[in-house]
Amino acid sequence: MAGHTTADYISHHLTFLTTGQGFWNVHLDTLFFSLVSGVLFLFFFYRIASKATSGVPGKFQCLVEMLVEWVDGVVKDNIHGSDVRHQIGSLALTIFCWVFIMNAIDLIPVDFPPQFAELLGIHYLRAVPTADISATLGMSVCVFALIIFYTIKSKGLGGFVKEYTLHPFNHWAFIPVNFLLEAVTLLAKPISLAFRLFGNMYAGELIFVLIAVMYMADNIIPQVLGIPLHLIWAIFHILVITLQAFIFMMLTVVYLSIAYNKSDH
């Protein structure tokens, strides 16, 4: 721990391992745990796929098949074009699993990652990538780029320009107003997507840290109360991390369906 006071403890647990200064500041811990989460997802699915059989499937194969069918159903309900359905389906599955694994890191006791890092001479370490706005905003920017891509793919460059200049008021005189309204709506999608995930995961991480502070109290009462509170919040947080992964995936699919489906607008 970086200090001896409660404020020092909280500050230490909420400080990233960084390199660089200013705009070029990079959160190394966020990058590391994001990559580890992605590798775990790929390794797990590769192992299941390589051992898949046409006979009686194992428990993990059943789990993966159910997950794939569920995500495929979500995509089919939203994407009308079969030519991109598999692409967006693969993206949706990746988003859900990747975000879920990154969220699930929050269930590791808050003192374990920093204390292990201290053994390696690393003074600061935050293990939950989705509690970092730079990570969630980075994913949302990728979704934003895909929204632009699929809008142009579906409607053409001319249709893309018309969509953001002649809607909702179909007259050339309202082009500036239309563009402003549509630009705000378009930019709000990735921003809200990023801050929704970040806000929920940051709050969850902070609550775990505050509960851990109770174990440091001199009085026995908060120390005892910290145990059931920790357990209750951890159980509830399982729902939160799953729900947030689903919401991020679902909104991505919905945004891309609006961008691609010609019937919209």
Swiss-Prot record:
It is found in: Cell inner membrane. InterPro entries: ATP_syn_F0_a_bact/chloroplast, ATP_synth_F0_asu, ATP_synth_F0_asu_AS, F0_ATP_A_sf. Keywords: ATP synthesis, Cell inner membrane, Cell membrane, CF(0), Hydrogen ion transport, Ion transport, Membrane, Transmembrane, Transmembrane helix, Transport. It comes from the Bacteria. GO terms for molecular function: proton-transporting ATP synthase activity, rotational mechanism. Its main location: membrane. GO terms for biological process: proton motive force-driven plasma membrane ATP synthesis. The chain crosses the membrane at residues 26-46, 88-108, 132-152, 168-188, 195-217, 231-251. Pfam families: ATP-synt_A. The keyword tRNA processing does not apply. CDD domains: ATP-synt_Fo_a_6. It is a multi-pass membrane protein. One of its GO terms (cellular component) is plasma membrane. Belongs to the ATPase A chain family. F-type ATPases have 2 components, CF(1) - the catalytic core - and CF(0) - the membrane proton channel. CF(1) has five subunits: alpha(3), beta(3), gamma(1), delta(1), epsilon(1). CF(0) has three main subunits: a(1), b(2) and c(9-12). The alpha and beta chains form an alternating ring which encloses part of the gamma chain. CF(1) is attached to CF(0) by a central stalk formed by the gamma and epsilon chains, while a peripheral stalk is formed by the delta and b chains. Key component of the proton channel; it plays a direct role in the translocation of protons across the membrane. This is ATP synthase subunit a. The lineage of its organism: Bacteria, Pseudomonadati, Pseudomonadota, Gammaproteobacteria, Pasteurellales.
